[in-house]
Amino acid sequence: MRSEGDSWDITTSVGSTALFVATARALEALKPDPLAVDPYAELFCRAVGGSWADVLDGNAADHELQSDDFGKHFVNFQGARTKYFDAYFRRAVEAGVRQVVVLAAGLDSRAYRLSWPDGTTIFELDRPQVLDFKREVLGGHGVRPRTERREIAVDLRDDWPQALRDSGFDAEAPSAWIAEGLLIYLPAAAQEQLFTGIDSLACLGSHVAVEDGAPLPDAEFAAKLEEERAAVAAGGERPFFQLLYNERCAPAADWFSEHGWTALGTPLNNYLREVGRPVPGPGSEVAAMFARNTLMSATKP
């Protein structure tokens, strides 16, 4: 279970979820009809090696991401999610935004793989071990950012707004924010603090996009925890539910709407249909998670 002030690197706790997601993006890129192509996700997997690389080579048939149920749908999910947020950033820069803030940046490679207008600055916030890993892997392969990229080594439970300002963020200029795959790892109070921080630093003309997930019913979450603990103890599964804060928060679209933003939430399953990917059936392992997931974007008029 999580504890206040807990820490991690790229292969442990919350950090390892970034590798898991990068592996899914790499598998999506191998499809003949990918929704999004992240050419650098594979580099991260191979840098760590082991099962992270084996699954890309087809040498890990029992890996979760290779399963017909969870694996197939999770890879589709990552392709769709990446496509959604890539399109969000294109709209933001077309509207004139030249400051981008990536919260809990993890192995996000958009600074390296998307086209950015001249004068764009991307601020990436995460724990120092995670930022170091990404920079060293990509730098070791000669990959350079396509615009100015500034690393801010900070825990989002600390005073990240001040750290962002100290790194040159201009609160008087429009900005585009992203919280992708982050909120489920925050307690409710920290999510409120995060949204408040974004709102306080974002001037008129700014944009924000988040992945929002409603909590599971308490009894269902407790059952998932018990099942997962047994599987982890047997060596057959990585922790996931043990990393979550299953706490009730205001839906992101509601929160930002109530604070003067124009927000639109798109249920994940609706977006999957829109981009031509199957929605998990009622008996699927991921059905409950997908049904509670919403992709939201908002502008501050």
Curated annotation (Swiss-Prot):
Keywords, alphabetical: Methyltransferase, S-adenosyl-L-methionine, Transferase
Organism superkingdom: Bacteria
GO molecular function: methyltransferase activity
SUPFAM superfamilies listed in its UniProt record: S-adenosyl-L-methionine-dependent methyltransferases
Enzyme nomenclature, EC number: 2.1.1.-
GO terms under biological process: methylation
Entry binding sites for S-adenosyl-L-methionine: D126, D155, L156
Gene3D superfamilies membership: Vaccinia Virus protein VP39 (3.40.50.150)
Class of this enzyme: transferase
Purpose: Exhibits S-adenosyl-L-methionine-dependent methyltransferase activity.
Family: Belongs to the UPF0677 family.
Name of the molecule in the record: Putative S-adenosyl-L-methionine-dependent methyltransferase MMAR_0539
